[in-house]
């Protein structure tokens, strides 16, 4: 499989050391240097290839790319859950050129914004021996919050907390 390049190994090592004492951090890398891959390798390292990860992105096209990349490059098979409003994306007005491609994205797993459906998928993957990754657009954060609230309530707080949250293109968040 794919092997990390030198600059990615340095980033992974720095992240490993940094997260021993911190619970938040930034990974800043130039375009085309493999941030998505590096984030996956950091997640696998920090969580010993097992845990619940939230991967946030600004657009559905980026969600599809990230999902495909993580599933292709993961050490152990990933259980992916996609949270986005496909219907809203496909009705996007073409003038919104920033995310024009959203309407033609084919996601590898069905997408939803229904909190009950999200909670059901999370429960289904609870004992998965690998990473369970919730891939979501920022605009769907409320659906994740509602699903997480439901699962934490059902499991008396024993399941549903994210072990790691990755915010891609975080500089675009408000």
Q: What are these regions, as identified by a protein language model?
A:
Residues 1-33, 37-51, 68-72, 92-113, ...:
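ATP-dependent helicase/translocase motor core
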Residues 13, 64, 143:
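Alpha-helical elements of the RecA-like P-loop NTPase motor core of helicases
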Residues 117-123:
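Conserved helicase ATPase core of P-loop NTP-dependent helicases/translocases
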Residues 46-48, 74-75, 125-128, 156-159:
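Conserved catalytic network of the ASCE P-loop NTPase/AAA+ motor domain
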